[in-house]
Regions:
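ATP-dependent adenylate-handling active sites, centered on carboxylate activation for C-N bond formation
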Residues: 1-160, 164-168, 183-200
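PAPS-dependent sulfotransferase catalytic domain
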Residues: 173-185
Length: 200
C-alpha cells in the first residue's frame, strides 16, 4: 500500500517567536510530530513567510470576492497552492474546534456566560473599521443581540439537560450556525481558487 500524504502549516521562525494565547495555547509542531510518528504518514512541513503572505493578499481577495481576513486567508491560499501539487482532494482539520469545543469561549467563564456571540463580546474593534456615518445609521450591538437571541431560541433542546449542558449546547449551536459557516466558506473559496478540493 501507499502511505498517506499529510501536511502541516506553520510560519517561518514560529518556534522562535511563538507566544501562547487563548486560541493557540501551544505550538502545533510537537503534536504534528506525534501524529506522524503514530500514523507513519508521508508528511510535509509547509512554511509561509511574510513575503508569501503579501504576494497572496490580492489573490485572497479575488478568491473570496471581497476583502477578507488578510494574513489568515493569504497564508491559507499559499498553503493550498502547495498541497495541490501532491493531492487534488484533501481532508482538513477545519471546523474541528467548533465540533470538539476547542475555542476559548467553550471554557472561559466570562465567554460561556455572555449573552452575546462569544467571539464578539466587544464590538469596538469592529466599529473602528466603519465610517462614523455608518455607525450612526447601523446599531451593531442591537443587530448582534437580535441575531444571537434568535439563534439561541432555535437551538435544539434535550430533555433532562442541566443548565450547564444546555448552555454548552447553545454555544455549540452558535458556532455551527455562525462561526463555522465563515470558516467553511473561506476554506472552500481559498482551496478551489487553487484547484484543491478540501473536505472538512
Amino acid at each position: 500500500g501507499k502511505n498517506l500524504n499529510t501536511f502541516s502549516f506553520d510560519f517561518v521562525n514560529n518556534h522562535k517567536y511563538f507566544k501562547s494565547n487563548a486560541f493557540q495555547p501551544s505550538e502545533d509542531r510537537p503534536w504534528v510530530d506525534k501524529m506522524v510518528d503514530h500514523a507513519k504518514t508521508d508528511h510535509r512541513y509547509l512554511e509561509c513567510d511574510n513575503e508569501n503572505m503579501i504576494e497572496n493578499l490580492y489573490k485572497a481577495v479575488d478568491a473570496r470576492d471581497l476583502p477578507c481576513m488578510a494574513d489568515v486567508e493569504s497564508s491559507m491560499l499559499y498553503f493550498c497552492s502547495k498541497v495541490v501539487k501532491y493531492n487534488k482532494v484533501t481532508l482538513t482539520g477545519e471546523c474541528a474546534d467548533e465540533i470538539f469545543g476547542g475555542y476559548p469561549w467553550f471554557h472561559k467563564e466570562e465567554c460561556f456566560k455572555a449573552e452575546i456571540f462569544p467571539w464578539s463580546m466587544d464590538m469596538q474593534p469592529r466599529k473602528m473599521l466603519l465610517n462614523d456615518d455608518i455607525i450612526q445609521k447601523v446599531d451593531l450591538e442591537s443587530y448582534a443581540r437580535t441575531a444571537y437571541q434568535k439563534t439561541i431560541n432555535e437551538t435544539p433542546k434535550l430533555y433532562g439537560e442541566d443548565r450547564i449542558e444546555a448552555r454548552r449546547r447553545q454555544i455549540s449551536y452558535l458556532n455551527l450556525r455562525w462561526f463555522m459557516v465563515t470558516l467553511m466558506d473561506r476554506m472552500d473559496r481559498t482551496s478551489m481558487h487553487c484547484g484543491l478540493e478540501a473536505r472538512v
